[in-house]
C-alpha cells in the first residue's frame, strides 16, 4: 500500500488392536514433513489434522503445537489459538514466536493490555516475526489504551451507510477525525490499521509511539509512524480509541482526482463490523458484528457467493482462486490494488505463460515511492466460485508476500476484479460474500 503440487496421505500408525499398556509410537519424520508440506500449500485443515495426530503421539512436540496455534490464528479461532499457543509457550518458554502470535490473539480481541503483556521477554526491536508480520503490536501504543476500550462504538441503529465520494480509481469517502471537519480517506484492504497522512497527523497533534518499516508495492519500503486517535466518525457512527499508522499520503491526491487525501480505511476497521463495500451502489455499509446482523444480511435479496478466507499477519485476507489453467492457489484480497484486477508473483506470471506488455509500461506511485508499472492480461482468474475473463493485471516489481507467511501466495485480486460486486466481509465465520 512454496509451492508443492502433491499431497501425501499418511496412514494412522496406531491400529484399533493396539494394546492399552503399549508405549505410544512417536511421530515419524514423514508425518511431520507431510504436515509441513500441506501447510506450505495452504491446505490448513488437512495440515491441522496431521499436526493433531502428531501431538496425540507426542504431547511435547513444540513445532506441531505451535503450528496448531498458527492455523487456529489464521482461521480466527481465537480460543483454540490461545490454547495451543499457551501450550507451546509452556513447552519452550524462551521461544518468542508463540508469544508474538498470542499477543496477536489478544490484539484481535481488542485486549491491548494482555497483548502487550504477552510480549514480555520478547526482543520487540529485533524479533523477525513481529517486525515482518505483526508490526501493529507496538507495546507503547498498546499500553497507552489502558483503561479505555479500543474501537468503542457510539451510535444508534444496527448499521450505518456512507456514500463513496467517488469509486474510481479506488473508493473514496468523507470521514471526521477527533470530531474535526470532514476529510477524505480512500478504502484499501491491503492496509491494516486506519492510516493518516503524516502532515495531517501533525496538524491534529497525534501522539507518536515509534516507527516501523512498511512494505509496499514492488517490495519497496518506507517508514511508517505509529500512534492513536480519539475518534473516527464514519456515517452516523463514531468509533473511539483507535490505533493509527502515519505515512505520506497527500502526495497521492492527484492520482485520486481529489483535493486532498488525508487517510486510509483498512482491514482492521472492517474487522470490527460486518462490512460491505458496495461498488454498484457506491457506498460503504458498516453493520454491528453480531449473529443477528449476519442472519439479517443473509436473508436480504440477491444471490450471494461465499468464499472462505483466512487472515495472515494482522490483515492479509487470503482465499482460494485460480490463475489461467494452473492448479488452485491462495490469493490475497487487496481492494487497494489500483488500475488492475490482479497482481501476480513473477514466478506465477512465468509459470502461466503470461506476457508482459513492456511497450505499455508507465510510471506510478505506491506507498514506498515511484514504480515502473507494466500491464498484462490474464485470460482466466477465479476467486472462490467467481470467475472473470480477460482481467487486467500489473507488474511493478517483486511480490514481497509470496512466501512471507510460510505458505505460497500467488498474488492478489484487486479493485477491477471486485468492482462489479457488493463485497461483504464476515470475520466471525471467515468468509467473503460477493453479490
Summary of predicted features, one role per range:
Residues 1-8:
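Bacterial N-terminal signal peptides that target proteins for export
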Amino acid at each position: 500500500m512454496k509451492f508443492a503440487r502433491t499431497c501425501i496421505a499418511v496412514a494412522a500408525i496406531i491400529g484399533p488392536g493396539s494394546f492399552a499398556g503399549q508405549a505410544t509410537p512417536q511421530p515419524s519424520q514423514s508425518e511431520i514433513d507431510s504436515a509441513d508440506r500441506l501447510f506450505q500449500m495452504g491446505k490448513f485443515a488437512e495440515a491441522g489434522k496431521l499436526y493433531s495426530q502428531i501431538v496425540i503421539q507426542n504431547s511435547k512436540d513444540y513445532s506441531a503445537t505451535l503450528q496448531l496455534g498458527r492455523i487456529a490464528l489464521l482461521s480466527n479461532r481465537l480460543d483454540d489459538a490461545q490454547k495451543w499457543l499457551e501450550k507451546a509457550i509452556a513447552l519452550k518458554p524462551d521461544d518468542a514466536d508463540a508469544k508474538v502470535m498470542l499477543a496477536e490473539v489478544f490484539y484481535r480481541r481488542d485486549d491491548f493490555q494482555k497483548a502487550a503483556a504477552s510480549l514480555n521477554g520478547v526482543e520487540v526491536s529485533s524479533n523477525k516475526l513481529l517486525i515482518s508480520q505483526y508490526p501493529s503490536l507496538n507495546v507503547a501504543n498498546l499500553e497507552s489504551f489502558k483503561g479505555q476500550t479500543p474501537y468503542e462504538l457510539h451510535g444508534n441503529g444496527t448499521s450505518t451507510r456512507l456514500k463513496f465520494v467517488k469509486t474510481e480509481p479506488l473508493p473514496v469517502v468523507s470521514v471526521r477525525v477527533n470530531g474535526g471537519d470532514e476529510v477524505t480517506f480512500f478504502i484499501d484492504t491491503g492496509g491494516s490499521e486506519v492510516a493518516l497522512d503524516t502532515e495531517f497527523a501533525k496538524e491534529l497533534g497525534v501522539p507518536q509511539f515509534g516507527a516501523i518499516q512498511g512494505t509496499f508495492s514492488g517490495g519497496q519500503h518506507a517508514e511508517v509512524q505509529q500512534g492513536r486517535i480519539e475518534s473516527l466518525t464514519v456515517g452516523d457512527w463514531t468509533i473511539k480509541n483507535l490505533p493509527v499508522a502515519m505515512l505520506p499520503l497527500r502526495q497521492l491526491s492527484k492520482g485520486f482526482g481529489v483535493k486532498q487525501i488525508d487517510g486510509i480505511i483498512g482491514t482492521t476497521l472492517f474487522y470490527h463490523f460486518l462490512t460491505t463495500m458496495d461498488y454498484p451502489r457506491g457506498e460503504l455499509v458498516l453493520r454491528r458484528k453480531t449473529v443477528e446482523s449476519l442472519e439479517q444480511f443473509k436473508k436480504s435479496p440477491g444471490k450471494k457467493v461465499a468464499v472462505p478466507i483466512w487472515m495472515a499477519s494482522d490483515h492479509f485476507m487470503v482465499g482460494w482462486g485460480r490463475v489461467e489453467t494452473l492448479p488452485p492457489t491462495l490469493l490475497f484480497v487487496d481492494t487497494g490494488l489500483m488500475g488492475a484486477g490482479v497482481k501476480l508473483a513473477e514466478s506465477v506470471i512465468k509459470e502461466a505463460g503470461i506476457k508482459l506488455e513492456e511497450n505499455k509500461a508507465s510510471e506510478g506511485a505506491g506507498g514506498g515511492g515511484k514504480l515502473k508499472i507494466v500491464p498484462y492480461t490474464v485470460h482466466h482468474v477465479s476467486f472462490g466460485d467467481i470467475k472473470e475473463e480477460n482481467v487486467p493485471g500489473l507488474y511493478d516489481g517483486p511480490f514481497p508476500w509470496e512466501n512471507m507467511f510460510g505458505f505460497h501466495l500467488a498474488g492478489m485480486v484487486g479493485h477491477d476484479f471486485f468492482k462489479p460486486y457488493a463485497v461483504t466481509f464476515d470475520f466471525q465465520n471467515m468468509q467473503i460474500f460477493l453479490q
